[in-house]
Amino acid sequence: MSSPNTWSIGSSVYSPVFSQKMTLWILLLLSLYPGFTSQKSDDDYEDYASNKTWVLTPKVPEGDVTVILNNLLEGYDNKLRPDIGVKPTLIHTDMYVNSIGPVNAINMEYTIDIFFAQTWYDRRLKFNSTIKVLRLNSNMVGKIWIPDTFFRNSKKADAHWITTPNRMLRIWNDGRVLYTLRLTIDAECQLQLHNFPMDEHSCPLEFSSYGYPREEIVYQWKRSSVEVGDTRSWRLYQFSFVGLRNTTEVVKTTSGDYVVMSVYFDLSRRMGYFTIQTYIPCTLIVVLSWVSFWINKDAVPARTSLGITTVLTMTTLSTIARKSLPKVSYVTAMDLFVSVCFIFVFSALVEYGTLHYFVSNRKPSKDKDKKKKNPLLRMFSFKAPTIDIRPRSATIQMNNATHLQERDEEYGYECLDGKDCASFFCCFEDCRTGAWRHGRIHIRIAKMDSYARIFFPTAFCLFNLVYWVSYLYL
């Protein structure tokens, strides 16, 4: 008879303890053998992965973060900088330029929108926790020490407050602090307008500590110190963004030596607007003033009105061109061009005034007047045989009407009494006989229009050649 604690199977006898051991070994082998593991669908695998990630991420109770912050702020004095009395606090800075523009040339300033970041170490903010970094909002900013950074050349600066203050604070467990904020700054830029509108400028953005000298705070640029956004959305209008560069310098003042960080934005002016608004109209007005050289000199109202109109138009254009500039005391490139155009237009008017003056004030020959007054001179005057090469008056019969063909007027002018015109012009009596002195300029007043048709266009073309080569390539 068998014992109650044993089972008889065939010729083998098994105890309950041995049976339990065998069961455990079989379950262990089945769990290790991959063929008996169940196949999981993709959805099950994703859930498993997410669950695994959730398990590996330590769950941080809200109370733990509150305890950490309370412990950090307990006994913390935000009026004192880190490592005070030990070493200077090192501030690493970088910025992201969101946009630049517009540039106001009259006020000599430009607008820039940036994200400004500062990083430093504060040993008082170290903590031991599974949390590596505390991501905090702007409410924590006023409770810890923040660098007193200010922008030296800013005229006006605004921090963004909609919908909440655009400030961010990060505290790592090793005491590293990151503080970023978004700013819109109207910064001063001293524009040198000598080459306007072909000028290029480097507009700075300078910042430093307001109260801590170099012995207390030292600023340094990060490796990727300044980055820019999409320049196509920038409102530069008249300018093109060329590039940027950043520098570090020490400025000495009566209160100490301060580390000053600067970013220079290189801008180049676009000429399209000023070419359409100033250069082309001024050139056309100058060319229009030359039309008077082809109008008959006896058409006094036509030539006078044309000259006065072009002069007044140039005056208006010069006034409009100056409105887009500050009231600088030096001459710009545009001022030079407009002034020369005004001189050409005014000279065309003066040319006709000179021509009309000499034509309307011509006098008969003095010798002829004497002969008319004294009949004895007419009787006894002896004339040497000469050949008169002047064109004589001719009578032309046309349609039963008699017309006198006018003699060339250039032989009818005399030098004006009381005028030393012989020093500059050839008096007409002398010109006819060829008795004018050596070195005297031989100018025929009647042909001033013919001379002006060649001189004015040639001089203006030479001026444009020198002007554009000098300002664009030299």
Curated annotation (Swiss-Prot):
Extracellular face residues: 39-274, 322-333, 473-474
Alphabetized Pfam families for the sequence: Neur_chan_LBD, Neur_chan_memb
Spans through the membrane: 275-295, 302-321, 334-358, 451-472
One annotated GO biological process: chloride transmembrane transport
Cytoplasmic side stretches: 296-301, 359-450
Regulation of activity: Allosterically activated by benzodiazepines. Activated by pentobarbital. Inhibited by the antagonist bicuculline. Inhibited by zinc ions. Potentiated by histamine.
Disulfide bonds listed in the record: C189-C203
GO molecular function, one term: GABA-A receptor activity
PROSITE patterns: NEUROTR_ION_CHANNEL
Glycosylation sites: N51, N128, N246
Compartments where found: Postsynaptic cell membrane; Cell membrane; Cell projection, Dendrite; Cytoplasmic vesicle membrane
Tissue-specific expression: Expressed in brain neurons (at protein level).
Keywords: Cell membrane, Cell projection, Chloride, Chloride channel, Cytoplasmic vesicle, Disulfide bond, Glycoprotein, Ion channel, Ion transport, Lipoprotein, Membrane, Palmitate, Phosphoprotein, Postsynaptic cell membrane, Signal, Synapse, Transmembrane, Transmembrane helix, Transport
Membrane topology type: Multi-pass membrane protein
GO terms under cellular component: axon; chloride channel complex; cytoplasmic vesicle membrane; dendrite; GABA-A receptor complex; GABA-ergic synapse; inhibitory synapse; plasma membrane
Chain positions found as Phosphoserine: S381
Signal peptide stretch: 1-38
Chain's role: Gamma subunit of the heteropentameric ligand-gated chloride channel gated by gamma-aminobutyric acid (GABA), a major inhibitory neurotransmitter in the brain. GABA-gated chloride channels, also named GABA(A) receptors (GABAAR), consist of five subunits arranged around a central pore and contain GABA active binding site(s) located at the alpha and beta subunit interface(s). When activated by GABA, GABAARs selectively allow the flow of chloride anions across the cell membrane down their electrochemical gradient.
Family from the record: Belongs to the ligand-gated ion channel (TC 1.A.9) family. Gamma-aminobutyric acid receptor (TC 1.A.9.5) subfamily. GABRG2 sub-subfamily.
Note from the entry: This subunit carries the benzodiazepine binding site.
Subunit structure: Heteropentamer, formed by a combination of alpha (GABRA1-6), beta (GABRB1-3), gamma (GABRG1-3), delta (GABRD), epsilon (GABRE), rho (GABRR1-3), pi (GABRP) and theta (GABRQ) chains, each subunit exhibiting distinct physiological and pharmacological properties. Interacts with GABARAP. Interacts with KIF21B. Identified in a complex of 720 kDa composed of LHFPL4, NLGN2, GABRA1, GABRB2, GABRG2 and GABRB3. Interacts with LHFPL4. Interacts with SHISA7; interaction leads to the regulation of GABA(A) receptor trafficking, channel deactivation kinetics and pharmacology.
Comment text on domains: The extracellular domain contributes to synaptic contact formation. GABAARs subunits share a common topological structure: a peptide sequence made up of a long extracellular N-terminal, four transmembrane domains, intracellular or cytoplasmic domain located between the third and the fourth transmembrane domains.
Official protein name in the record: Gamma-aminobutyric acid receptor subunit gamma-2
Organism whose genome encodes this protein: Mus musculus (Mouse)
Name of the gene encoding the protein in the UniProt record: Gabrg2
